[in-house]
Amino acid sequence: MTSQELKKLLNDIDHKSYPAYKALRGSYDFDRYILNIEHVQGDPFAAPSQLSISLPVTTAGYPDFSMANTSALTALCDFLLRSFNAEVTRYSFQAKGSGKSGLIQVAQPGLEIFERSDCEIVKEKLIIRFFVGFPANGRTINSRELEKIFFEFLPKCVEKSLLYRNLCADTLKKWIYLAEDQAAIRTQLAALSLCAFIADGSILPRESGISQKPMKSAVAFTSPASLRVSLDLPHAGKISGMGVSKGITLIVGGGYHGKSTLLNSLELGIYNHIPGDGREYVITDDTAIKLLAEDGRFIKDVDISLFINDLPNKKDTHSFSTEDASGSTSQAAGVIEGMEAGSRLFLIDEDTSATNFMVRDAFMQRVISSDKEPITPFTARARELYENAGISTILVAGSSGAFFHIADTIIQMDNYHTVDITSHVKDLLCEYPVPADSAKPFALPASKRIMTKDPQGTPKRRDYRTGAVKNNDNDSLKVKVLTRDSFMIGKQTVDLRYVEQLTDSEQTASLAILLKYAVEHLIDGKKTVAMIVDELNRIYKRDGMSAFMDGRPLSGGYTMPRTQEIAACLNRYRRA
């Protein structure tokens, strides 16, 4: 349909009851672009209507370099989304009415760059998805105000923010070139046997606990000469910084000297960051996971026997389950689940770990004999994890000297300055013999959790004639995102507070629909968590996020999480 036909429809339904807005669903040609009205809200106080704009890239005029590869495309879409957000924010609520009338809303990205459903290029077309609150007076349609949005506000937003001729070409080029340089660093990590890289001049401290913006007047990162490496990038040329080698790296130093700040930067180095963030060239192995203790965590059928055996209650640690894990059992499960999710790097902060899981000093071994202690500490397994499973560790510590014995590289943070003290510490260790190791022989976990469909996870209905409660196979589970780190599926809350590398609510929204899809289509009592994650990734690569929408049109608000976060979500689901 043409835009003029849309204008006629608006005129026809003006002053009618709000449900008459449903007649607007469809696609309308605005010459340069197509406006798609995909879902219309039920009333002005409900969640806003779902719209999209599709624009041929030839019309938009984007240069070839901006679409030359996946990294460039992702950066282009991120840039356009930020540009469109800046424009629509100016017009939001300029159209008046009740409730959400006049709202124009699109995702507001943070400092990380993601592939998002909000803005993507598919088959030579840019698609940008957003939400609009259709105006009403009470529950009576005010289509004159909606006409302003469709025929005045949105055309200006498209013109100013999506057409290349009106964009800042230099800023866009900076966005694209940085993304390609970041991809080049990730490629070079493996070739140099590095698990992370922090460029000289990076700004690691953040503004505050509630702001991820770079701290003003912060000490810029400088690499120790002994750990400095140089990388050649396609656009930035030669840059230098600290290369963190594979193996076991220990970060030590006094309190408030920057140990955790460095680790926090590394844990988010799995993502690309925008220009000006300060961590643009902080790049970490993209399978890295942060491990920490999670008291009270649900665990099911995890083989934690690598760390815990011979429990007094006779529980089988080769297939360990609990509704209320201790700090040590939760962290042990996290290690095993991370291995199964394909992680090649563990990031651990002593402050957020279970002490009895991490270390057991020599004097404690003398007081409590090994046959009375079911826990084999991480210090006894870290070397074996690297040599037998290829998993490196970066560990922050400040209280125990036991960690020095297992480290390949030891970095001291001194007032945010980095010092390589490996040789100095190795000399001192001659005076402190390695504590006796009573650990059982290393063996990779054998059993893996098979997810089974729990009847409680299936929607129920009550038969109005008999009063009996039955499974309703025609209904689907309801999901609701609560916060950035939790969502509801059915009546269960999935708690992701300790999955600390989640940074965006769109990741959480995606985890919710992925879990819903898995419960309804993949969990069958035969597949392991890893198999289900692989299948979800395969479907996404083939069909995109729309494959998980149950036939509904894809909206903005989704970004595909990593394999590691999908696995973490499945492992925290209590009903499978």
Predicted regions and their residues:
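Conserved NTP phosphate-binding and transfer environment spanning the P-loop NTPase/kinase superfamily
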Residues: 387-390, 396-576
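Carboxylate/His-rich catalytic cores and anion/metal-binding grooves
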Residues: 190-196, 200, 256, 263-294, ...
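Glycine-rich phosphate-binding P-loop
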Residues: 239-271
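Flexible beta-alpha connector loops of hexameric P-loop NTPases
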Residues: 142, 297, 307-328, 360-375
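Phosphate-binding/switch loop-helix module in NTP-utilizing enzymes
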Residues: 319-353
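N-terminal accessory targeting/assembly segments
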Residues: 1-184, 188-193, 204
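Conserved P-loop NTPase nucleotide-binding/switch module
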Residues: 339-382, 386-387, 399-405, 409-426
